[in-house]
Amino acid sequence: MKKEEMAITVKDLHVYYRDMNRFSLKKGGLKARGTGKIFKAVKGVSFEVPKGQILGICGKNGSGKRTLLRAISGIFSPDSGSINLHGNSISLLSIGVGFQKQLTGYENIFLSGMLLGYSKEQIEAKIDDIIEFSELGDFIYRPVRSYSSGMHSKLAFSITAILETDIMLIDEVLSVGDIHFKEKSYNKMKELISNDDRTVVIVSHNSNTIKELCNKVIWLHEGLIKDQGDPNIIMDKYEAFMRNEG
């Protein structure tokens, strides 16, 4: 039997933060005092994602979902453990990540595309499609700092959806925006993940999204994998857990 090709391999991953909650005012600005308390956001997580699979990640706030996703994307460096990616390009679709807020939406399309490895000519060939899908109109020529979270989400999703990558990391963006755009982006997402060569990791609180789109789900709790497996089974367990927590 042919061995399954892996797109993402995470081994014994640890990611820590230092809580610098004590500051002093010195010349040049705020300076942190003391060592601060170390917060262990991800603690010894290991898993593999086969090429073409859609993995869901669930867990309550503070469970380490976002930290894990940003570590996979390369934004955060592991304190220990390893992350191996087997793809030509990777994109992180997350609110508040990846845009230069002083630049316009139009300029950020080029910046994002170049960071994904696209040439200026390749981006120019697709920029009209990106702008049209985003529905931002003339706002595309305004600085991103003036955008609402919904507008930011529309632009981020449109760039990632039109400038397709081998590995897509999606952080809750399908829950932001007006009802029309949510439906349109959800349908586009289903179209994108229908490609057997594309690997997707989705962080979501929405059980229906994970059940419908994902082949497998990992349930994170306090930085550890609490459970993993079939989305229908795991999400039912997770929902019951959250009801008891409430």
Label each region the model flagged.
Residues 222-223, 238:
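Conserved ABC ATPase "signature" C-loop
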Residues 204-205:
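H-loop/switch region of ABC-family ATPase nucleotide-binding domains
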Residues 58-60:
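The feature captures the beta-strand-to-loop junction immediately N-terminal to the Walker
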Residues 210-212:
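A short, surface-exposed alpha-helical micro-motif characterized by mixed small hydrophobic
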Residues 1-41, 232-245:
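Pre-NBD coupling/linker segments of ABC/ABC-like ATPases
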Residues 28-29, 110, 122-139:
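Conserved ABC ATPase "signature" region
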